[in-house]
Amino acid sequence: MRDPRGPRSRAQRHEPPIKIKDIFALFRIRSYVLNTAAMTAMTFAIGGISFWLPRYLFDYRGADFGDAPNLGRINLIFGAITVAAGLIATLLGGWVADRVQRRLPSAYFLVSGIAILLSFPAIIAMLRVPFPWAWILIFVGVFFLFFNTGPSNAALANVTPPAVRATAFALNIFIIHAFGDAISPPLIGWIAGKWNMDAAFVVMAAVTLLASIFWIWGARYLGHDTLLAVESTRQRPGEA
């Protein structure tokens, strides 16, 4: 992903220690906050689907696999789909977002928001389409869940000043995992126990809509916040 700020100067390599106020200042960057919220929702969905989908297919859709469904084989196929779809989507998502970003400053968020929106119908349809055709929908759903990986992380870097960028990434990683894939498996399990697994997958699909809303909402701030990060870099005292 292209970094709009260019190389760091000699002065920037000797930054003063990060202060608590610098960390709290990150929460005043609207595109950073909305990006983190969207990535949390995305991670929640990925964590829940990764944990529960093989078991769902074995317990609820076993008849689609013949008289003797094999959980190991289901895990193997799903794992292969996740690796292939995730890798292709990550590379293609970055390439598409970079091309669109040349004309549209908000492209990183718009590409992320539209892509994850497309995962919603694939996840819902997977619940009703018989196998082996449902594997195609699973591939499509996983593909669009990972399509945002490049652009969302590039946007994260672009809106944070270099002096706090590592801290911004660390805080983002903590939040998206603590409130994303760390809690989604037990929460989805609770929903499945109270209602059923179909309802649990509808909830996971709905969370992808929430991620889409956050990214599309944040698109209006992304260009402005990127420019502010550039200006904050240029105005740092003692810079060459």
Predicted regions and their residues:
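A late C-terminal transmembrane helix in Major Facilitator Superfamily
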Residues: 159-195
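A membrane-interface helix-boundary motif in multi-pass transporters
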Residues: 67-71, 107-110, 190-208
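Multi-pass alpha-helical transporter architecture, strongest
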Residues: 122-129, 202-239
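Extracytoplasmic gate region of multi-pass secondary transporters
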Residues: 29-91, 145-149, 153, 180-185
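C-terminal transmembrane helical hairpin of 12-TM major facilitator-type secondary transporters
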Residues: 103-152
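C-terminal membrane-cytosol helix-exit motif in multi-pass small-molecule transporters
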Residues: 1-10, 214-220
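Juxtamembrane intracellular "pre-TM" segments in multi-pass secondary transporters
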Residues: 6-36, 63, 236-240
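Interfacial helix-cap and linker-helix signal at transmembrane-aqueous boundaries
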Residues: 57-58, 96-97, 101, 187-196
